[in-house]
Amino acid sequence: LSFTLNDGDFVTVIGGNGAGKSTMLNLIAGVYTADAGSIVLDGADITKLPEYKRAKLLGRVFQDPMMGTAGNMGIEENLAMAYRRGRTRTLRWGISNEEREFYKEKLQRLDLGLEGRLTSKVRLLSGGQRQALTLLMATLQNPRLLLLDEHTAALDPKTAHKVLTLTEKITSENRLSTLM
């Protein structure tokens, strides 16, 4: 398989169950090791790069709304983890007022009322709210490539439509290259 994605491209891969769509995304993310060939991102061969190092370059939203977030942590804590991904860690964990305002502004754009619930545990959110939060977390740092693994499959049709609309809005505003 060989393909090229340009900046801002949104490509949807279509195939039946077991066709290898999720496997392809897992290969790109570094979950699986490629037997042959190479994976090149922005001209750099990332084939041998470990998954945790690829995480700096990639955003990812899974099919299961429970994945991608820490359910026992608050909304702002989840956002802080995503925002700080790939950065040097310090002993300080607190969230500054500036960061909190940044998160509120980002959450407001989702139009789900989450900006007033920053300390709410993520496990208390609906599947659609959680998936929208995961999408926001995956795109906070403007990744080089956004991987969406059937991210609306577990949602009801109305909620799936809302999440897809948010996906289109976020990816087009940030010119994110996206593989779904």
What does each of the following model-derived ranges do?
Residues 14-16:
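The feature captures the beta-strand-to-loop junction immediately N-terminal to the Walker
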Residues 45-59, 67, 71, 89-96:
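ABC ATPase NBD coupling module
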Residues 72-88:
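Q-loop/switch helix immediately C-terminal to the Walker
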Residues 138-139:
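ABC ATPase C-loop
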Residues 146-150:
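Catalytic Walker B motif of ABC-type/P-loop ATPase nucleotide-binding domains
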Residues 157-159:
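Helix N-cap at the start of a conserved alpha-helix in ABC-type nucleotide-binding domains
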